[in-house]
Swiss-Prot record:
Subunit annotation: Homodimer.
Family: Belongs to the succinylarginine dihydrolase family.
The entry's keywords: Arginine metabolism, Hydrolase
Single biological process term from Gene Ontology: arginine catabolic process to succinate
Name the UniProt record assigns to this protein: N-succinylarginine dihydrolase
Native organism: Shewanella piezotolerans (strain WP3 / JCM 13877)
Recorded metabolic or biological pathway in which this protein acts: Amino-acid degradation; L-arginine degradation via AST pathway; L-glutamate and succinate from L-arginine: step 2/5
Annotated EC: 3.5.3.23
Record-linked PANTHER family: N-SUCCINYLARGININE DIHYDROLASE
Function: Catalyzes the hydrolysis of N(2)-succinylarginine into N(2)-succinylornithine, ammonia and CO(2).
Keyword NADP (UniProt): no
EC top class named in words: hydrolase
Entries under Gene3D superfamilies matching the protein: Succinylarginine dihydrolase (3.75.10.20)
Reaction(s) the record says it catalyses: N(2)-succinyl-L-arginine + 2 H2O + 2 H(+) = N(2)-succinyl-L-ornithine + 2 NH4(+) + CO2
Amino acid sequence: MKHFEANFDGLVGPTHNYAGLSFGNVASLNNAAATSSPKDAAKQGIKKAKALADLGLVQGMFAPQERPDLHTLRRIGFTGSDAEVLNKAAKEAPALLRACCSASSMWTANAATVSPSADTHDGKLHFTPANLVDKLHRSIEPVTTGNILQATFNDSRYFKHHQHLPEHTSFGDEGAANHTRLCSEYGHAGIELFVYGQEATNPSAPKPQKFPARQTLEASQAIARLHQLDDDNTVYMQQNPDVIDQGVFHNDVIAVGNQNVLFYHEQAFLNTQAKLEEIKRKFGESPLHFVEVPTAKVAIQDAVKSYLFNTQVVTLPSGEMAIIAPTNCQENPAVHAYLNELVTLGSPIKQVHYFDVKQSMQNGGGPACLRLRVAMNQDEVAAVNQNTMMNDALFARLNQWVDKHYRDRLSVADLADPQLVIESRTALDELTQIMKLGSVYQFQR
């Protein structure tokens, strides 16, 4: 049977804006209050997803969340019509309004953690939406994320869906951005790497001092239990607290893995050598490639600014691996020089493809943030909601949909415009029909 690693990218929502909501994310903070282009952002994401499909990869799309989130604004005491709720929130609590208008669900690397059927006791593909409790604007996502996942992977013979973890910082969970999987082949049992920032129940354990550690060891262990993983195919690694304090808010900003390659910065982890030995031991005899980028070649600051590690490492139908990088990597001399060298180093990575995702990058999310990886066999791929899979027809339909519903420009002040609610709901209602999702949104229920 054939096996694939599919990428599911998040469609950028109609309220894409730069509100600087993500403390610890340097790009997000640096671009706060800039004017965004929801239309450009959505089209950049759709174009990137189509390009990967054209490379021969299995590519799907996730719908965005309903924003502005009037349900949450009402839950915290704002009353009246939709227009009155927005007006009151804009006057009395503008920061809360901004949080309820974020299009951050486009970064589907944070949507969930996924364990393929080759790794799990029951032989099913497991999904757990991330609770994202560290950031208010993301903590309101998990219920709708679960609805969208279930509408996309809706065959219970193959797919097992879990509720997100308890909404407490002890179980802070940021999804696949802190999880990667190493394997000899996508269909073989692999090693699932869970990377955490701190131990919630051990105050004396190392943790960052300046920026928050968003993922806890306790959350990672809970996911592994839910997904029915063995100790023999799980490794827990702590991210270096010093790099978190330098703006590496998720592990996918400093490391990325694919099949038998782990591509990471020299400073990415604590106890690196011991953990690499554990991975080798559990991985077995098959070839395994650790590609370590030394600080002398790429400083942490350059890695964060360019998002060198927030690239996608993908296996092409030819068997060669390619890096899908943002154009920012081309524009950074040290990073560009390193990538040119990387393809000559003898690892399976032989190609680099550059994509313009600047609207996402300015809010702190590169190519890897925009996708959730799902390793599947051909029966599982066939069981996915096919209306979510990228092809020529969906590409054309989504571009037409964006042209019809999205604004060219959006400022933070525009978030209080009642017309934006109507535009957004009209767009999402039509999208659920295009992608055959059913009633996944609060306003449809």
